[in-house]
């Protein structure tokens, strides 16, 4: 494979490439790894949303699609975004409550020149966010977000004449998205199995798409929390194992073939096997990456440095190549596009199927797992049993000074991999410390074959972050 000059090889293993981060999120004040986020009416205000609407209409002429999740503050922000777009002369197609991938797919398939989704994804209910979408359905890249922030800060917006303000239209993005998902899977193979599926929409936007996808696939669906409620009364929005205990219990009680859980905007999906066991997001990523490499007779898989080594193991063994990027779906999608990758995704349940959409897609992930179960004629527990076993632990530490943390990490770990944050590799595991792009926290990941060792690495990472942020000068030796 020809490696473009911007690719920086730092790993001696053949078929493994790392890409250095091209623009630091630290250079931007408002835009993080997933647009602009903050606590509604405190950090993210109506005034800011209005200006963001003016910003996107100043950057992209013509029709702009606007959608939102189920959060209580989303209608307020949607109104402000639309007002800003109209004032700058842009037209709006209002698609209402819709998952992020549904909005993105709609923009790709329609005449819209851009999109805006109002969502804070998996963040707590008091948060909300605003994210821009290109006309090919991809999220704005870091460079595009930086450009948007410059326009926003300058206040040099377009301003329409009284008879040139935009108009508002409406359309059904969810119907178009559902049809798009169905076209990309083997419907007859899935339908013949008559799978029993327990679906937990988490009171989010998946309520308007995933049940209908399962219906089209002839699945018998047992629904949990599949009604819109921006208070998220049943569980926290993030579909991690500790939040979806009810899903696990229902899968066992009804003897279902599969359990599926979504986050607030349904760009992610996590899974429970037929025994009621949670299947880790990295294992699902590895399973699907292996499938796509085998199906294509090789190819490139793109994933962030935070992903489990099990992904690399199965991809290389199947004859594929792995490209590691910084954390964040926009950069993963961008590199997938540039390298014609066969598959990509993050180890948080966000999988990217390039034949459908270069963006994370929880609904498509659900359909593709069912398809794999059908064509292989195996339950999920059997499909994942040969994926290499690693122990990964994740945690987060409050971090109000991200610049100080990064400077401290560079000082203490000179030989670390700084693709995104600091990844320190040991003979028997690795540790990643990176400031979040959406919250005032530092995320810490540790992985090893041995559970005890993984926990030791995690504890070391937490201790190191706290010492750097407190200004404690002692350097802890660890190997």
What are these regions (language model features)?
Residues 26, 39, 128-254:
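Gly/Ser/Thr-enriched, mixed-charge loops and adjacent short helices
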Residues 146-179, 183, 274-347, 352:
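Proline/glycine-rich low-complexity loops and linkers
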Residues 1-25:
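N-terminal amphipathic/basic-hydrophobic helices that include classical n-h-c signal peptides
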Residues 141, 223-225, 277-296, 329, ...:
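Gly/Ser/Thr-rich active-site loops/lids in small-molecule metabolic enzymes
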Residues 54, 58, 64-128, 213-272:
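N-terminal small/polar loop signature for handling phosphorylated ligands or for N-terminal nucleophile
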Residues 258, 296-479:
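Phosphate-binding and adjacent anionic-ligand microenvironments
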Residues 17-89, 113-114, 166-197:
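An N-terminal, well-structured beta->alpha segment
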């Amino acid at each position: 494979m020809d490696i473009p000059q911007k690719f920086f090889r730092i790993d001696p293993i053949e078929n493994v490439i790392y890409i250095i981060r091209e623009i630091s999120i630290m250079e931007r004040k408002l835009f993080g790894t997933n647009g602009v986020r903050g606590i509604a009416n405190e950090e993210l205000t109506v005034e800011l949303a209005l200006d963001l609407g003016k910003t996107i209409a100043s950057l992209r002429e013509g029709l702009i699609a606007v959608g939102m999740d189920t959060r209580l503050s989303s209608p307020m922000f949607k109104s402000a975004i639309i007002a800003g777009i109209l004032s700058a002369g842009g037209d709006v197609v209002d698609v209402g409550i819709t998952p992020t991938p549904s909005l993105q797919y709609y923009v790709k398939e329609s005449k819209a020149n851009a999109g805006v989704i109002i969502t804070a994804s998996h963040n707590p209910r008091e948060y909300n966010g605003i994210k821009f979408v290109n006309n090919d359905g991809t999220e704005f890249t870091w460079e595009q977000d930086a450009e948007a922030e410059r326009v926003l800060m300058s206040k040099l917006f377009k301003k329409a004449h009284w008879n040139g303000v935009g108009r508002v239209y409406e359309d059904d993005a969810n119907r178009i998205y559902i049809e798009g998902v169905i076209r990309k899977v083997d419907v007859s193979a899935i339908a013949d199995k008559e799978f029993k599926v327990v679906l937990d929409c988490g009171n989010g936007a998946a309520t308007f798409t995933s049940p209908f996808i399962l219906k089209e696939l002839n699945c018998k669906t047992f629904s949990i929390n599949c009604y819109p409620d921006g208070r998220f009364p049943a569980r926290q929005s993030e579909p991690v194992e500790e939040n979806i205990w009810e899903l696990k219990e229902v899968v066992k009680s009804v003897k279902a073939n599969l359990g599926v859980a979504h986050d607030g905007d349904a760009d992610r999906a996590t899974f429970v096997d037929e025994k009621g066991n949670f299947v880790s997001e990295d294992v699902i990523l590895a399973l699907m990456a292996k499938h796509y490499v085998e199906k294509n007779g090789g190819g490139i898989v793109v994933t962030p440095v935070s992903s489990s080594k099990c992904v690399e193991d199965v991809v290389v063994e199947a004859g594929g190549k792995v490209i590691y990027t910084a954390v964040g779906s926009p950069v993963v999608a961008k590199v997938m596009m540039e390298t014609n990758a066969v598959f990509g995704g993050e180890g948080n349940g966000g999988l990217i199927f390039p034949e459908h959409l270069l963006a994370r897609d929880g609904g498509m992930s659900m359909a593709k797992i069912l398809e794999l179960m059908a064509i292989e004629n195996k339950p999920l527990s059997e499909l994942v049993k040969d994926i290499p076993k690693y122990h990964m632990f994740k945690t987060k530490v409050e971090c109000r000074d991200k610049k100080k943390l990064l400077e401290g990490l560079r000082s203490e770990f000179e030989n670390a991999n700084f693709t995104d944050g600091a990844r320190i590799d040991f003979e028997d595991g690795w540790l990643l410390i990176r400031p979040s792009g959406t919250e005032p926290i530092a995320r810490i990941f540790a992985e090893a074959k041995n559970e005890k060792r993984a926990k030791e690495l995690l504890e070391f990472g937490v201790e190191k972050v706290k010492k750097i942020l407190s200004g404690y000068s002692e350097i802890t030796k660890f190997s």
